[in-house]
Amino acid sequence: MEDICFNVSQNIILPKFKNLSDDEINYKNGSDLVTAADIEAEKELKKNLLKILPTSNFIGEEEYSRNENILNFYNEDSYCWTVDPIDGTTNFANGRDKFAIMIALTFKEKILRSWIYKPLDKIMCSAIVNEGAFINNNKIITKGTKIIEETIGSISTKYWEPGFKDKLKIFKNIFKEVNSYRCIGFEYIDIGIGNRNFAILSKLSPWDHIPGILFVREAGGADIDLI
């Protein structure tokens, strides 16, 4: 998997970083950015992942924007890849350095393996169900804090209802630091290694969260529903 992500990064993603023309940046579904690099990277990832498991299904963020029915693959009795070719597209399109490739392998909604790859740093974060979380093949365990004033977290409020957004504002007055990278892959990694204690998220698209959820779980963290 490291070779696949490295090659896609070197051949497709990084050549476009800070080098996108205006016609290579567009919007899908009205407000979500998509770049030529997202589209081409997803095609290449799909081709390579289906070579690994030829009978598996594939759900990619860009493919979903054209065909929402592909989410039904999660209900089938088969393996399924879930991919976000560039998590943090807004950062990528604006020349900011926090973006990642996110991949997960599931079977009937059970997450089996996941990978989060940081192209600029050439760092692979991965997880195997019941076996642990790893950074460049070194096993890691998260650490927390019992002191609320030392807590650092992320809150994404873009898609919350206005009333719930107001309730979340209280966290900014309690914790040491609350911010967002605008790249959930980076935030999951930070939680896994203990640099961040929590993330409160509002948009739960599978490609944004399935890879990171397994990484955090296997590092010793947890995920819960607030509402």
Regions found by a protein language model. Name each.
Residues 39, 62, 85-88, 119, ...:
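Generic detector of well-ordered alpha-helical packing
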